[in-house]
Structure formats: structure tokens, C-alpha cells
């Protein structure tokens, strides 16, 4: 037994469990913990988590480009309560808030309801934040400017969107609740998509050489579109797109066949007129604010 004990004592400890090894492992673990603490303290962990959630919500076709754009726009964040980081000039601060709100609103398509509604809330909070010379809350002036920016950036003709803006805008000093903000922004985005679809439809009707369509044909399509919209009892703007999408090829073919059946000469219809009249059908279904 004494010989066995001596042999056991003579066995050297494993190399990984020497005192210096234990110290290096301890230092590495401490460094890892301190790095994690640092990332957590400066907000990087939460920032990355939020960015990944945005990717899951929006499900973009190019996630890397989406993340690059996301982090680029993180620099536009303005202080909520003013302070040393507040840029000089109230106008500059307002433009930054508008830009950031627009960016949030475009992160997800309006058909992704949960993600879009969440982004609407974030945009509303961004515009409602107080500052040195601004009381918390969103006024009609800022809200109306945002709607104009949405329509302008969507490249819709001004004469097409102007009637809608008159319906959904608020007075400059009027307080705008979240429900009105959501309805107005959603309606603008849906109108832009509606006009884009109408433009694609006009391309099928137009004479490419003259860039105009036969008036009888254009009127037949507008009448069919109006019938589809009137048949929809839903008041939600997104449902108007569904109604327009239900224009089956049979109904359109019948309308076009009737239109070209006459032999009387017809005046041309321009793209601008077609889009304006198509948008008017949409806007007629929108309820005015208040």
C-alpha cells in the first residue's frame, strides 16, 4: 500500500490543471464576462437584438443590405428630451425626426399588419417626442408634412394625391392621436400602390408609339374598376386593393370588347388623366378625418 501511495503522489498533475493554467482560464473567463458586460452597458446587445427583430418582421429579400441601411439610420436618432446632442435649429431637428419616422414606416409593407403597425407606433413616438422648445405630442402640421413626404417620395403625381391629402390632413395646431396617424399613413401607402397598379394597367392599354390609350377602352376599364370598388363594402383602404385585384380577365375582356365594338372615332386618353380618374375612384371611398 505504501508503494501504491508513493506512485500516486509521483504522478504529475495534468498540464491543463497547473496553477498557471487555472489562472489563464480564469483571466479568459473574466475577460469574456467583462466584454459581455461592456456590450450590454453601452446598448450594443439590445441594438443587435432590435435589428434582428426588424429583419424577422420585414423579411427583406436582401437582409445584409437591410441591416446596413438600418444601422446607417441609427445615427439619425435625436434625443427625446433635448440636451447637448440636440442639433441647432428647430427646423433641422424636425427634419431629422421626419426622416427617421419615414424610415420606420418603410421597414415593412403595409400588408404585413403586425410589423407595419409596430413601425407606425415607433414613428408616432419619434414625431411626438418633446424637446427644448417642443411639447410632447404630434400636431397637424408635422403630421400633414409627413403625409406629403410619403406621397412625394412615392413619385405619385401631385394632382393625383392632392385630393386625398385634403381629406386626411389635420389643421396645423390640431392634436393628432395614434389612430388618426395610422389611418392617414396607411391610406397614403395604399393609394401609392393603387396608382402604381393603375399605371401598369394603362401600359397594357396604351399605344406605345403615341403614349395614349383609346378613350373608349380607358373608360371601359375605369367603369369596371368603379364597379369593383362599389361592390366592396369594406371601409379599410387595403381592401380597395383587393377589390381592384378581383377584376377578372373575363370582365375586363367583355368591357374591352364592348368598347372597341363601336366604329366611331374616339379621342385619346392620356396616362395622367387615367391615373387621376382611377385615383379619384379610390379617394371617393376614403372617409375624411373628423
Swiss-Prot record:
One of its GO terms (biological process) is adult behavior. GO terms for molecular function: microtubule binding; tubulin-glutamic acid ligase activity. GO terms for cellular component: axon; centriolar satellite; centrosome; cytoplasm; dendrite; microtubule; microtubule organizing center; motile cilium. SUPFAM superfamilies: Dimerization-anchoring domain of cAMP-dependent PK regulatory subunit. InterPro entries: DD_TPGS1, TPGS1. Pfam families: TPGS1_C. PANTHER family: TUBULIN POLYGLUTAMYLASE COMPLEX SUBUNIT 1. This is Tubulin polyglutamylase complex subunit 1. It comes from Homo sapiens (Human). The lineage of its organism: Eukaryota, Metazoa, Chordata, Craniata, Vertebrata.
Amino acid at each position: 500500500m505504501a508503494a501504491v501511495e508513493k506512485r500516486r503522489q509521483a504522478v504529475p498533475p495534468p498540464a491543463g490543471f497547473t496553477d498557471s493554467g487555472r489562472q489563464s482560464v480564469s483571466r479568459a473567463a473574466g475577460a469574456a464576462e467583462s466584454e459581455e458586460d461592456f456590450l450590454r452597458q453601452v446598448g450594443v446587445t439590445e441594438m443587435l437584438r432590435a435589428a434582428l427583430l426588424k429583419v424577422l418582421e420585414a423579411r427583406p429579400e436582401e437582409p445584409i443590405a437591410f441591416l446596413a441601411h438600418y444601422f446607417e439610420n441609427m445615427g439619425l436618432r435625436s434625443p427625446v428630451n433635448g440636451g447637448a446632442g440636440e442639433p441647432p435649429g428647430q427646423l433641422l431637428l424636425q427634419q431629422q425626426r421626419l426622416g427617421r419616422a419615414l424610415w420606420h414606416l418603410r421597414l415593412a409593407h403595409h400588408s404585413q399588419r403586425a410589423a407595419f403597425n409596430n413601425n407606425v407606433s415607433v414613428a408616432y413616438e419619434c414625431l411626438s417626442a418633446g424637446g427644448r422648445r417642443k411639447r410632447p405630442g404630434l400636431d397637424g402640421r408635422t403630421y400633414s408634412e409627413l403625409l406629403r413626404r410619403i406621397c412625394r417620395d412615392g413619385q405619385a403625381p401631385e394632382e393625383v394625391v392632392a385630393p386625398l391629402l385634403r381629406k386626411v390632413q389635420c389643421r396645423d395646431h390640431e392634436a393628432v392621436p395614434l389612430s388618426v396617424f395610422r389611418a392617414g399613413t396607411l391610406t397614403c401607402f395604399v393609394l401609392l400602390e393603387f396608382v402604381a397598379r393603375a399605371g401598369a394597367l394603362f401600359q397594357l392599354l396604351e399605344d406605345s408609339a403615341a403614349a395614349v390609350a383609346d378613350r373608349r377602352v380607358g373608360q371601359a376599364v375605369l367603369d369596371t374598376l368603379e364597379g369593383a370598388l362599389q361592390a366592396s363594402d369594406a371601409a379599410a383602404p387595403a381592401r380597395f386593393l383587393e377589390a381592384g385585384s378581383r377584376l377578372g380577365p373575363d370582365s375586363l375582356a367583355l368591357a374591352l370588347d364592348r368598347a372597341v365594338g363601336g366604329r366611331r372615332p374616339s379621342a385619346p386618353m392620356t396616362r395622367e388623366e387615367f391615373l387621376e380618374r382611377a385615383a379619384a375612384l379610390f379617394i371617393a371611398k376614403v372617409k375624411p378625418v373628423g
